[in-house]
Amino acid sequence: MSNERRDFLKLGAAGLAVGAAAASVLDVRKAAAQAAPTSLLRTVLDRGHVIVGSGSTNAPWHFEDAAGKLVGMDITMAHILAKGLFDDDTKVEFVQQDPAARIPNITTGKVDITIQFMTVTPQRAQLVAFTRPYYVEGIALLTLPGSQMKTFDQLQAGGANTKVSILQNVDADNSVHMVLPQAQVMQIDTQANVIQALDSKRVDAAAVDLSTVRWMVKQTPDRYADSGKKWFSMLYSAALKQGDQDWLNFVNTAFDVAMYGHQNELYDKAFADYFGLNPPAREPGFPSI
Protein backbone atom coordinates (compact mmCIF):
# COMPACT_ATOMS: atom_id res chain seq x y z
CA MET A 1 0.00 0.00 0.00
CA SER A 2 1.40 3.44 -0.90
CA ASN A 3 2.19 6.04 1.74
CA GLU A 4 -0.42 8.35 0.22
CA ARG A 5 -3.09 5.65 0.52
CA ARG A 6 -2.18 4.94 4.15
CA ASP A 7 -2.28 8.66 4.97
CA PHE A 8 -5.69 8.95 3.33
CA LEU A 9 -7.08 6.08 5.38
CA LYS A 10 -5.65 7.57 8.57
CA LEU A 11 -7.31 10.87 7.80
CA GLY A 12 -10.56 9.07 7.09
CA ALA A 13 -10.47 7.27 10.42
CA ALA A 14 -9.65 10.51 12.19
CA GLY A 15 -12.56 12.18 10.45
CA LEU A 16 -14.93 9.50 11.68
CA ALA A 17 -13.66 9.88 15.23
CA VAL A 18 -14.01 13.67 15.13
CA GLY A 19 -17.52 13.35 13.72
CA ALA A 20 -18.55 10.95 16.46
CA ALA A 21 -17.10 13.20 19.13
CA ALA A 22 -18.87 16.24 17.73
CA ALA A 23 -22.16 14.37 17.69
CA SER A 24 -21.72 13.31 21.30
CA VAL A 25 -21.29 16.86 22.60
CA LEU A 26 -24.37 18.23 20.82
CA ASP A 27 -26.79 18.10 23.72
CA VAL A 28 -30.57 18.06 23.53
CA ARG A 29 -31.06 21.73 24.37
CA LYS A 30 -28.62 22.84 21.69
CA ALA A 31 -30.43 20.64 19.20
CA ALA A 32 -33.77 22.07 20.29
CA ALA A 33 -32.48 25.58 19.70
CA GLN A 34 -31.98 24.76 16.03
CA ALA A 35 -35.69 24.05 15.50
CA ALA A 36 -38.17 26.79 14.62
CA PRO A 37 -39.51 28.48 17.78
CA THR A 38 -43.00 27.12 17.14
CA SER A 39 -41.92 23.60 16.17
CA LEU A 40 -43.06 20.65 18.24
CA LEU A 41 -39.52 19.30 17.88
CA ARG A 42 -38.30 22.02 20.26
CA THR A 43 -41.17 21.33 22.68
CA VAL A 44 -40.56 17.59 22.75
CA LEU A 45 -36.81 17.93 23.28
CA ASP A 46 -37.32 20.44 26.11
CA ARG A 47 -39.97 18.22 27.72
CA GLY A 48 -37.68 15.19 27.73
CA HIS A 49 -40.08 12.60 26.35
CA VAL A 50 -42.37 12.14 23.36
CA ILE A 51 -46.14 11.62 23.70
CA VAL A 52 -47.37 8.97 21.27
CA GLY A 53 -50.96 8.02 20.55
CA SER A 54 -51.49 4.31 19.90
CA GLY A 55 -53.68 1.36 20.83
CA SER A 56 -53.38 -1.73 23.00
CA THR A 57 -55.66 -4.40 21.54
CA ASN A 58 -54.44 -5.23 18.03
CA ALA A 59 -51.58 -7.69 17.66
CA PRO A 60 -49.05 -7.52 16.11
CA TRP A 61 -49.26 -3.72 16.04
CA HIS A 62 -50.04 -2.63 19.59
CA PHE A 63 -50.96 -5.02 22.40
CA GLU A 64 -50.00 -6.09 25.90
CA ASP A 65 -47.70 -9.07 26.31
CA ALA A 66 -47.97 -11.69 29.06
CA ALA A 67 -46.26 -9.33 31.50
CA GLY A 68 -48.67 -6.49 30.72
CA LYS A 69 -46.07 -4.52 28.78
CA LEU A 70 -47.21 -2.59 25.71
CA VAL A 71 -45.51 -4.09 22.64
CA GLY A 72 -45.96 -4.40 18.88
CA MET A 73 -44.66 -2.96 15.63
CA ASP A 74 -46.30 0.44 16.21
CA ILE A 75 -44.86 0.52 19.72
CA THR A 76 -41.40 -0.26 18.37
CA MET A 77 -41.64 2.68 15.96
CA ALA A 78 -42.38 4.91 18.96
CA HIS A 79 -39.28 3.60 20.73
CA ILE A 80 -37.26 4.21 17.56
CA LEU A 81 -38.43 7.82 17.57
CA ALA A 82 -37.49 8.22 21.25
CA LYS A 83 -34.07 6.73 20.52
CA GLY A 84 -33.53 9.32 17.80
CA LEU A 85 -34.70 12.17 20.02
CA PHE A 86 -32.95 11.34 23.28
CA ASP A 87 -30.64 8.40 22.58
CA ASP A 88 -32.97 6.56 24.99
CA ASP A 89 -35.78 4.47 23.54
CA THR A 90 -37.68 4.41 26.86
CA LYS A 91 -38.53 8.12 26.85
CA VAL A 92 -42.05 7.61 25.51
CA GLU A 93 -45.41 8.36 27.08
CA PHE A 94 -48.19 6.37 25.42
CA VAL A 95 -51.73 7.68 25.17
CA GLN A 96 -54.04 4.76 24.45
CA GLN A 97 -56.72 5.82 22.02
CA ASP A 98 -59.50 4.41 19.89
CA PRO A 99 -58.80 4.46 16.13
CA ALA A 100 -61.49 7.11 15.73
CA ALA A 101 -59.44 9.43 17.97
CA ARG A 102 -56.25 9.21 15.94
CA ILE A 103 -56.75 12.42 13.96
CA PRO A 104 -58.60 14.46 16.64
CA ASN A 105 -55.87 13.79 19.21
CA ILE A 106 -53.27 15.10 16.75
CA THR A 107 -55.14 18.25 15.79
CA THR A 108 -55.98 19.14 19.41
CA GLY A 109 -52.41 18.55 20.58
CA LYS A 110 -53.22 15.73 22.98
CA VAL A 111 -50.41 13.71 21.39
CA ASP A 112 -47.23 14.69 19.57
CA ILE A 113 -47.68 11.94 17.00
CA THR A 114 -49.96 8.98 16.30
CA ILE A 115 -48.40 5.62 15.50
CA GLN A 116 -51.35 3.25 15.20
CA PHE A 117 -51.51 1.17 11.98
CA MET A 118 -52.85 4.19 10.11
CA THR A 119 -53.49 3.75 6.39
CA VAL A 120 -52.35 6.67 4.25
CA THR A 121 -55.07 8.17 2.06
CA PRO A 122 -55.27 11.50 0.21
CA GLN A 123 -58.39 12.36 2.22
CA ARG A 124 -56.60 11.90 5.55
CA ALA A 125 -53.59 13.82 4.23
CA GLN A 126 -55.84 16.89 4.04
CA LEU A 127 -56.15 16.72 7.84
CA VAL A 128 -52.75 15.49 9.08
CA ALA A 129 -49.18 15.19 7.83
CA PHE A 130 -47.99 11.65 7.18
CA THR A 131 -44.45 10.45 7.77
CA ARG A 132 -42.61 8.10 5.46
CA PRO A 133 -44.29 4.65 5.51
CA TYR A 134 -42.87 2.07 7.91
CA TYR A 135 -44.87 -0.89 6.58
CA VAL A 136 -46.80 -1.85 3.45
CA GLU A 137 -49.98 -3.66 4.44
CA GLY A 138 -51.98 -5.84 2.10
CA ILE A 139 -54.54 -8.61 1.91
CA ALA A 140 -53.39 -12.22 2.26
CA LEU A 141 -54.96 -15.65 2.59
CA LEU A 142 -54.68 -17.55 5.85
CA THR A 143 -55.06 -21.31 5.40
CA LEU A 144 -54.69 -24.54 7.38
CA PRO A 145 -51.39 -26.47 7.15
CA GLY A 146 -53.09 -29.86 6.76
CA SER A 147 -55.63 -28.73 4.17
CA GLN A 148 -55.81 -29.75 0.52
CA MET A 149 -56.35 -26.01 -0.12
CA LYS A 150 -53.20 -24.78 1.65
CA THR A 151 -51.48 -22.89 -1.18
CA PHE A 152 -52.72 -20.16 -3.47
CA ASP A 153 -52.32 -22.46 -6.49
CA GLN A 154 -54.58 -25.01 -4.80
CA LEU A 155 -57.15 -22.34 -3.98
CA GLN A 156 -57.07 -21.17 -7.59
CA ALA A 157 -57.46 -24.71 -8.87
CA GLY A 158 -60.55 -25.11 -6.70
CA GLY A 159 -62.40 -22.59 -8.85
CA ALA A 160 -66.03 -22.13 -7.81
CA ASN A 161 -65.60 -24.72 -5.04
CA THR A 162 -63.13 -22.53 -3.13
CA LYS A 163 -64.68 -20.76 -0.15
CA VAL A 164 -63.14 -17.65 1.41
CA SER A 165 -64.22 -15.72 4.51
CA ILE A 166 -63.63 -11.98 4.82
CA LEU A 167 -64.70 -9.13 7.07
CA GLN A 168 -68.00 -7.69 5.92
CA ASN A 169 -67.65 -4.45 3.93
CA VAL A 170 -68.81 -2.96 0.65
CA ASP A 171 -65.65 -4.03 -1.19
CA ALA A 172 -65.38 -7.53 0.31
CA ASP A 173 -66.48 -9.55 -2.71
CA ASN A 174 -64.37 -7.49 -5.12
CA SER A 175 -61.31 -7.81 -2.86
CA VAL A 176 -61.43 -11.61 -3.01
CA HIS A 177 -62.40 -11.79 -6.68
CA MET A 178 -59.34 -9.73 -7.64
CA VAL A 179 -57.28 -12.89 -7.17
CA LEU A 180 -59.87 -15.69 -6.97
CA PRO A 181 -62.54 -14.63 -9.46
CA GLN A 182 -64.64 -17.79 -9.08
CA ALA A 183 -64.44 -18.22 -5.32
CA GLN A 184 -67.45 -18.23 -3.03
CA VAL A 185 -67.16 -15.29 -0.62
CA MET A 186 -68.51 -15.50 2.93
CA GLN A 187 -68.77 -12.04 4.50
CA ILE A 188 -68.63 -12.18 8.31
CA ASP A 189 -69.22 -9.55 11.00
CA THR A 190 -65.94 -9.65 12.95
CA GLN A 191 -62.31 -10.50 12.26
CA ALA A 192 -62.39 -13.16 14.98
CA ASN A 193 -65.33 -14.85 13.29
CA VAL A 194 -63.64 -14.61 9.89
CA ILE A 195 -60.80 -16.72 11.29
CA GLN A 196 -63.16 -18.97 13.24
CA ALA A 197 -64.84 -19.90 9.96
CA LEU A 198 -61.45 -21.19 8.81
CA ASP A 199 -60.85 -23.00 12.11
CA SER A 200 -64.18 -24.80 11.76
CA LYS A 201 -63.41 -25.59 8.10
CA ARG A 202 -66.50 -23.81 6.81
CA VAL A 203 -64.12 -22.04 4.41
CA ASP A 204 -60.84 -22.95 2.76
CA ALA A 205 -59.14 -19.62 3.45
CA ALA A 206 -59.60 -16.42 5.41
CA ALA A 207 -58.81 -13.15 3.62
CA VAL A 208 -57.24 -10.91 6.28
CA ASP A 209 -54.44 -8.39 6.61
CA LEU A 210 -51.01 -9.61 5.52
CA SER A 211 -49.63 -8.64 8.93
CA THR A 212 -52.26 -10.82 10.62
CA VAL A 213 -51.29 -13.80 8.47
CA ARG A 214 -47.60 -13.32 9.23
CA TRP A 215 -48.26 -12.89 12.96
CA MET A 216 -50.52 -15.93 13.29
CA VAL A 217 -48.21 -18.18 11.27
CA LYS A 218 -45.25 -16.95 13.34
CA GLN A 219 -47.07 -17.67 16.60
CA THR A 220 -48.72 -20.98 15.69
CA PRO A 221 -47.16 -22.55 12.58
CA ASP A 222 -48.75 -25.89 13.44
CA ARG A 223 -52.21 -24.32 13.28
CA TYR A 224 -52.05 -21.80 10.43
CA ALA A 225 -50.33 -21.42 7.05
CA ASP A 226 -49.69 -18.60 4.60
CA SER A 227 -51.05 -19.40 1.13
CA GLY A 228 -48.26 -17.32 -0.40
CA LYS A 229 -50.51 -14.73 -2.04
CA LYS A 230 -50.59 -11.04 -1.10
CA TRP A 231 -52.19 -8.12 -2.91
CA PHE A 232 -53.76 -4.65 -2.60
CA SER A 233 -50.91 -2.62 -1.09
CA MET A 234 -51.71 -0.01 1.58
CA LEU A 235 -49.17 2.25 3.29
CA TYR A 236 -48.93 2.49 7.08
CA SER A 237 -47.43 5.75 8.36
CA ALA A 238 -47.27 7.78 11.52
CA ALA A 239 -49.28 11.00 11.51
CA LEU A 240 -48.66 14.41 13.04
CA LYS A 241 -50.01 17.94 12.91
CA GLN A 242 -49.79 19.76 9.59
CA GLY A 243 -47.52 22.75 9.10
CA ASP A 244 -44.56 21.65 11.26
CA GLN A 245 -41.84 20.80 8.76
CA ASP A 246 -39.05 20.56 11.35
CA TRP A 247 -40.95 17.93 13.35
CA LEU A 248 -41.94 15.99 10.23
CA ASN A 249 -38.37 16.07 8.89
CA PHE A 250 -36.99 14.78 12.17
CA VAL A 251 -39.44 11.88 12.43
CA ASN A 252 -38.72 10.89 8.84
CA THR A 253 -34.99 10.98 9.52
CA ALA A 254 -35.33 8.80 12.63
CA PHE A 255 -37.41 6.28 10.68
CA ASP A 256 -35.03 6.33 7.68
CA VAL A 257 -31.97 5.63 9.83
CA ALA A 258 -33.78 2.75 11.56
CA MET A 259 -35.10 1.15 8.39
CA TYR A 260 -32.40 1.93 5.84
CA GLY A 261 -29.35 3.10 7.76
CA HIS A 262 -27.06 1.88 10.50
CA GLN A 263 -29.35 1.96 13.56
CA ASN A 264 -31.64 -0.88 12.56
CA GLU A 265 -31.53 -3.19 15.60
CA LEU A 266 -34.95 -2.20 16.98
CA TYR A 267 -36.72 -2.29 13.62
CA ASP A 268 -35.18 -5.59 12.53
CA LYS A 269 -35.94 -7.34 15.81
CA ALA A 270 -39.55 -6.19 15.73
CA PHE A 271 -39.98 -7.24 12.10
CA ALA A 272 -38.69 -10.71 12.96
CA ASP A 273 -40.67 -10.98 16.21
CA TYR A 274 -44.01 -9.90 14.78
CA PHE A 275 -43.84 -11.02 11.15
CA GLY A 276 -41.34 -13.88 11.24
CA LEU A 277 -39.24 -12.24 8.52
CA ASN A 278 -35.99 -10.32 8.16
CA PRO A 279 -35.99 -7.01 6.24
CA PRO A 280 -33.90 -6.91 3.06
CA ALA A 281 -30.18 -6.52 3.69
CA ARG A 282 -28.87 -2.95 3.57
CA GLU A 283 -25.98 -2.64 1.17
CA PRO A 284 -23.55 0.27 0.95
CA GLY A 285 -23.65 2.15 -2.32
CA PHE A 286 -26.85 3.23 -4.02
CA PRO A 287 -29.46 4.33 -1.44
CA SER A 288 -32.47 2.02 -1.27
CA ILE A 289 -34.91 4.80 -0.32
Over which residues does each language-model region extend?
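C-terminal segment of N-terminal export signals and the immediately downstream linker at the start
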Residues: 1, 24-47
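Periplasmic-binding protein-like
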Residues: 56, 136-146, 210-255, 275-289
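Extended ligand-binding regions for polar small-molecule ligands
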Residues: 35, 80, 84, 161-162, ...
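Short helix-initiation/N-cap motifs at beta->coil->alpha
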Residues: 37, 92-104, 186-196, 234
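N-terminal secretory signal peptides and thylakoid transit peptides that target proteins
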Residues: 1-16, 28
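Acidic, polar ligand-binding/catalytic clefts
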Residues: 79, 83, 91-155, 224
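Short glycine-rich His-centered loop
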Residues: 49-73
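A ligand-binding cleft/hinge motif common to bilobed small-molecule-binding domains
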Residues: 101, 117-127, 175-178, 199-233
